Amino acid sequence: MPPTPERRPTWRRTLRALAVSYGVCATLALAVVLVFSDGNVVSYVLGLFAAWWLAPALLLVPLAAAAGSRRTLAAVTAPAVAAGAMAGPYVVNRFSPVEAAPDLRVATFNTSAWQGVDGLAALVRDREPDVLALQEIAKSSRAAYDERFGGLYPYRSYTPASTQGDGDAVWSKHPIVSVDTVTGLPEGARPAEVVTLDVDGRRLAVVSVHLASPCLFCSPSAARHSPAGDTANAARVRVEEARRFADLASERRAAGEAVVVAGDLNSAELNEPLRELRSHGLVDVHRAVGTRPGLTRGRSPGFARVDVVLVAGLEPVATREGAPGGSTHSPVIADLAWPS
């Protein structure tokens, strides 16, 4: 005869109560993210950190099932499904690696201004990417970057500096055919450009992106001076940026070019911009072939996957995370193949 609740050890009842409480809180947090998206500080931060607070549900489901606790199982089911949807592809990818040989290696890296120069040097030395999409390249540092890396990447393009003083860049071992300013971006967005490369006779359009930075927990005065405004407005800017880049990728793809959109989204899996980009036909390379969570923001293991490589007209082969050096982001390296 199974023990009644009164007969169960106190520690067991306590653990069960904690598990149920976690499940209820995680379910409510998930509802907040899905309903409010990135529209306020709470929902944005919950979406950003979701990989961590959803993960315990994957462990609690089998434990609750083994213990025969229906209440615990019911409480943790929703967060477990969400966690499985996020982590499941990486498990599947481990058992079904892509067999194709890569034709091109692309990397993206938010250098945190000059702080990440050692990480950039390691990335270039150890991984030898053909194309680099870089963020937070201060105008004052460009000459130093060119002096140090120009011999390896003779073709380089820099965006105009944003109001925050930083800019994006595309470095390439392949010739640059054209550079076009991205128009139609919302107010508060950083400048962006489409850099078209000639890769062994094929056209490749590359966009290095750095979506609007959030103004988390900042004062009204600080929000007024932030280029994208307060948290809610910055969220709207990021979504509009994502839609514009997605439309741009569709236009370039329709013109016969392969497309790479890579950079720092300031958003994670449950935040809206990444969903927006993927819903318009761009393939998230890490989700397609990655085998680990790839939490690139913050020191390893990081707290969120905000740095991504998305492609159209190219097939993902492999992806990995590089060493950050002094940056607050880890680089993402993507091996790609031309369609057969």
Q: What is the meaning of each model-derived region?
A:
Residues A100-P102, S213, S219-R224:
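Membrane-proximal, lumen/periplasm-facing interface regions of secretory-pathway glyco-
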Residues P3, R8-A66, L73, P79, ...:
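Metal-dependent phosphoester-hydrolase catalytic domains
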Residues R94-V106:
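Alpha-helical transmembrane signal-anchor/signal-peptide segments
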Residues A144-Y145, F217-P220, N271-L274, G298:
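Short, well-ordered secondary-structure micro-motifs
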Residues L46, R105-T111, L120-A143, T159, ...:
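Active-site beta-strand/loop signature of hydrolases that rely on acidic residues for catalysis
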Residues A51-W52, A83-S96, A113, D118, ...:
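Structured beta-strand-rich core segments of catalytic domains in phosphoester-bond hydrolases
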Residues G68-V92:
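Internal/C-terminal transmembrane anchor helices
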